[in-house]
């Protein structure tokens, strides 16, 4: 486990602060669209293997704080977006599909919602936590831009001037295994440190689209990232 290796190295070298980056997915699925934002002491109820491993890593990090006094801080972030993001992620994937004249591929109904936070706001949040956060505490890093995947697709189509083709540019495909309905987190602890979100959603989305329209050629081959369900080879089948 990579986290264990890093914790051991941090313990040996007496690091001043160990900031562990987790995810809002460890809280599990919001029961409805009216579910209150999750606060840091909410019980962890991960619903998929990725979230379960992130929760397990958190417990390991906390154990090093309690057992060895390692100065740890844990962050749980929502969806990050902005220039330079890998093309398999939602916004760059949709942008690159549209730029190539293809329909965006929406899992299920597309009504699943996520909060999005611009990468520059995320960077400032980490800087704030690194210098001001309390050792041993957990901090949510979330945006105020809750959007359904379908809404994001329609906004990208509009930004790219393709509104008259919207009906043909949205393709619904079978959903992913247990695709959580909603994640939403409370930022109060982070805001108490002096951080606040600065980038408006509309401006951040436009900046992101313009970057990918200009620089997506930097990725040598992104075709695999643009399919509806990227194939992951099984370790068992490879033996």
Can you say where each PLM-predicted feature lies in the sequence?
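Conserved active-site region of classical short-chain dehydrogenase/reductase
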Residues: 1-8, 88, 120-123, 127
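C-terminal substrate-binding subdomain of Rossmann-fold SDR/epimerase-dehydratase oxidoreductases
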Residues: 92, 98-239
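Hydrophobic structural elements of the Rossmann-like NAD(P)H-binding subdomain
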Residues: 19-21, 75, 94
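Conserved active-site helix of classical SDR/Rossmann-fold NAD(P)-dependent CH-OH oxidoreductases
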Residues: 3-4, 55-62, 92-95, 123-124, ...
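Active-site loop/turn elements of alpha/beta-hydrolase fold enzymes
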Residues: 23, 77, 109
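Conserved phosphate-binding and hydrolysis motifs of nucleotide-dependent enzymes
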Residues: 22, 50, 119
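Catalytic helix-loop patch of NAD(P)-dependent Rossmann-fold dehydrogenases
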Residues: 1-5, 12, 16-17, 26-74, ...
């Amino acid at each position: 486990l990579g986290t264990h290796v890093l914790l051991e190295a941090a313990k040996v070298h007496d690091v001043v602060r160990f900031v562990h980056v987790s995810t809002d997915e460890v809280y599990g699925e919001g029961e409805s669209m009216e579910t209150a934002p999750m606060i840091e002491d909410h019980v962890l109820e991960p619903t998929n293997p990725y979230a379960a491993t992130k929760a397990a890593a958190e417990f390991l990090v906390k154990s090093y704080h309690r057992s060895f006094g390692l100065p740890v801080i844990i962050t749980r972030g929502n969806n990050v977006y902005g220039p330079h993001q890998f093309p398999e992620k939602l916004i760059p994937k949709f942008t690159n599909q549209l730029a190539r004249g293809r329909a965006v591929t929406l899992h299920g109904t597309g009504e699943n919602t996520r909060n999005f936070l611009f990468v520059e706001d995320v960077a400032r949040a980490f800087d704030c936590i690194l210098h001001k956060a309390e050792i041993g505490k957990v901090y949510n890093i979330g945006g105020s831009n809750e959007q359904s995947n379908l809404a994001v697709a329609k906004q990208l189509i509009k930004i790219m001037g393709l509104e008259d083709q919207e009906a043909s540019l949205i393709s619904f495909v079978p959903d992913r295994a247990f695709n959580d309905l909603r994640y939403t987190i409370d930022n109060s602890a982070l805001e108490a440190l002096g951080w606040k979100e600065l980038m408006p959603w509309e401006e951040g989305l436009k900046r992101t689209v313009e970057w990918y329209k200009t620089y997506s050629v930097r990725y040598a081959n992104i075709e695999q990232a643009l399919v509806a369900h990227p194939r992951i080879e099984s370790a068992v089948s490879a033996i």
